[in-house]
Amino acid sequence: SDVWHTAEAVAPKAGVLQAKVHLSGKAKHVVCLTTAGAKKSLHILPAGKQVKDAIYTLVWNEKEAVNYVNDVEVARSKNPLAGEALHLLLRSYLPENVKGTGKMEIDWIRIYTNA
């Protein structure tokens, strides 16, 4: 398991997070915005929607979060982090009882805000 987490908050109450990502292997991959301590999160790579080579986008505001894969909406939900300071978290891990390896290669990550 590998984890990378920003120490300082990177995102305010609303914005856009985009990442151009290449995924491979059996590992599960996470790119998300989290609260301090990672108690709650908004995932840019929605569960079950991971595509090997894609541009993932998360658009969030006080009310909702919308996920896109290659500009196609794949998920929409209430924003559980409304009003929270958010940190960027990257993680790859092998689920329990899964053998093998995996790789997450990131070409770029962009965060746009109205700050």
Regions found by a protein language model. Name each.
Residues 1-115:
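GH16 jelly-roll
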